[in-house]
C-alpha cells in the first residue's frame, strides 16, 4: 500500500523522470503487478517521461524496460536493449545473473552462484572489481587484474571487458 501511495504522490507532480529504487521488493505478485502497471501507465500517458528502474529482479526488467544497464561495484558493466541483453549477454557478470535465474524446463535443483561474497565498496580498491568472484580466465579483465574499459561491441551494446575474452 505504501509503495502505491508514494508512486501516486510522485505522479501527481507530473515528473519527466521517475526514479524507482526496488519498487517491488517484498511485495506479493498481485501488488507487484499493480505497482508495475502504475509505472507503465505513466510511461504510456506521458511519452516524454522516463522511468529509471533500479532493481535486481530480472523478470521485472524483462517485463518493463527498453534498455538495461548492468552494474557491479558502482561501475557499469554492460548496456544493451532488453532484447539484446537477454539474447546475447556478453559480460561475465551479466551471464552469471542470467544463469542464476531458475529454469522451468530443466531438472537442475541447484542454482548457479558467484563464488565468494560481494566486497565492500570501500575495500574494492583499484583494478578489476570482479576478480574475487571469477576464475581469472572467466573474468571480464581476462585475468590481467586491470579494470577494463567500457566499449561498444555493436551498435547500442556496450560492455566493460577485455576484448581478449571473446577470442
Q: How should each PLM-predicted stretch be described?
A:
Residues 18-21:
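Catalytic Walker B motif of ABC-type/P-loop ATPase nucleotide-binding domains
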Residues 81-167:
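Short catalytic/signature loops enriched in Gly
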Residues 12-16:
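A short, proline-enriched helix->beta-strand linker immediately N-terminal to the Walker B motif
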Residues 23, 27, 31-109:
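P-loop NTP-binding/switch modules centered on Walker-like glycine-rich loops
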Residues 6, 50-52, 133:
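ABC nucleotide-binding domain signature
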Amino acid at each position: 500500500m505504501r509503495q502505491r501511495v508514494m508512486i501516486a504522490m510522485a505522479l501527481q507532480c507530473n515528473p519527466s523522470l521517475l526514479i524507482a529504487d526496488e519498487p517491488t521488493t517484498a511485495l506479493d505478485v498481485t501488488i507487484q503487478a499493480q505497482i508495475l502497471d502504475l509505472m507503465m501507465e505513466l510511461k504510456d500517458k506521458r511519452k516524454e517521461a522516463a522511468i529509471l528502474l533500479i532493481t535486481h529482479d530480472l523478470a521485472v526488467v524483462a517485463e518493463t524496460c527498453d534498455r538495461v544497464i548492468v552494474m557491479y561495484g558502482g561501475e557499469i558493466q554492460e548496456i544493451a536493449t532488453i532484447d539484446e541483453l537477454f539474447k546475447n549477454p556478453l559480460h561475465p557478470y551479466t551471464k552469471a545473473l542470467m544463469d542464476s535465474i531458475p529454469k522451468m524446463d530443466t531438472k537442475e535443483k541447484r542454482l548457479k552462484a558467484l563464488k565468494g561474497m560481494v566486497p565492500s565498496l570501500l575495500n574494492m580498491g583499484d583494478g578489476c572489481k570482479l576478480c574475487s568472484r571469477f576464475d581469472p580466465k572467466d573474468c571480464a579483465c581476462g585475468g590481467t587484474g586491470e579494470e577494463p574499459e567500457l566499449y561498444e561491441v555493436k551498435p547500442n551494446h556496450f560492455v566493460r571487458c577485455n576484448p581478449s575474452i571473446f577470442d
